Each structure stands twice: as structure tokens, then as C-alpha cells.
């Protein structure tokens, strides 16, 4: 478990990289391996405000092609900036797939590393977040985004 300001996080990895970040209350099989100390170091630095980009390898094995495309595009959104579900849909070449993009964000296995907290609704409202709206608000404020 990683103690973060938004609650305890369980970090799961494969030989290829981090596979999942789980918020408190989410269940995982017991035999899933924990992530390396480098992963926790980078998260510690992120929450301390000294890291703006993650360098640890990520493993999206098992994610559908469309969702992986959305997540790869989302990973490009820089620290301190936001995008919208509609902008992401356009960026992956499917401007009518706004709801599918929302679903991809909601099921993002790697929140924080792939920053779904930086996605807002088109009206500027926060929208949902798997870790809770309060956590999303905290992360955005921490990154200097006034929402």
C-alpha cells in the first residue's frame, strides 16, 4: 500500500511495468505482485510537487485497442493542464465517441500515471473520477488548476 494524500493506493505491476493503481476498497486477487520502489518514489515526488512527469514503464495489457488509444492520448496531457472528453474523442479520430472516451477514462487502470483527473466535462465541470470527485479536485488544485 502507498499512503497518498488522496487515500491508500495499491500499486500492481507485471514484468513489463505498472498494470494497475487501485483506490481504497477496490478488490484485487491476492497474488498480484506489487510495484517496484521506483514507482512509489515517483509517486512520493509527484505528491511533494517535485515531479511533473512519470518515467516508470506502464503495462496496458488487456486494455482494448480503443481504450488504449484514449489512454495514450490522455497520457500526453501535461501537468497543470486539462482537456475535455470531447477533445480526447477528436484526438483519437472519433469525435462522436465522447461517451466511449468517458468510459475509457472511468476504467483507466493507471490513474495518476495516466492522468484521467485532468479530463473535464465540456462545460468545465469536474465530471467523475474513480477515486472520488474530492480526490480529483485535490489533484487538480495540487497541480495549480483552479476548478
Residue ranges of predicted features:
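…primarily DNA-binding HTH/wHTH and HhH modules…
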Residues: 122-147
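Short Lys/Arg-enriched helix C-cap and helix-to-coil transition segments
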Residues: 112-119
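LysM (lysin motif) carbohydrate-binding repeats in extracellular/periplasmic proteins that recognize
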Residues: 95-98, 139
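Basic nucleic-acid-binding alpha-helical/helix-turn surface characteristic of O6-alkylguanine DNA
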Residues: 1-96, 144-147
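Regulatory, non-catalytic segments
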Residues: 98-108
Amino acid at each position: 500500500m502507498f499512503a497518498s494524500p488522496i487515500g491508500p493506493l495499491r500499486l500492481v505491476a507485471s514484468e513489463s511495468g505498472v498494470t494497475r493503481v487501485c483506490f481504497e476498497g477496490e478488490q484485487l486477487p491476492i497474488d498480484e505482485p506489487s510495484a517496484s520502489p521506483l514507482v512509489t518514489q515517483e509517486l512520493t515526488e509527484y505528491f511533494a510537487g517535485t515531479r511533473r512527469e512519470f518515467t516508470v514503464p506502464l503495462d496496458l495489457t488487456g486494455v482494448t485497442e480503443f481504450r488504449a488509444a484514449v489512454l495514450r492520448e490522455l497520457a500526453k496531457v501535461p501537468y497543470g493542464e486539462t482537456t475535455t472528453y470531447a477533445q480526447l474523442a477528436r484526438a483519437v479520430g472519433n469525435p462522436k465517441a465522447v461517451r466511449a472516451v468517458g468510459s475509457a477514462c472511468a476504467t483507466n487502470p493507471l490513474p495518476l500515471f495516466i492522468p484521467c483527473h485532468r479530463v473535464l466535462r465540456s462545460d468545465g465541470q469536474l465530471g467523475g473520477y474513480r477515486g472520488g470527485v474530492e480526490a480529483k479536485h485535490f489533484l487538480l488544485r495540487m497541480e495549480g488548476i483552479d476548478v
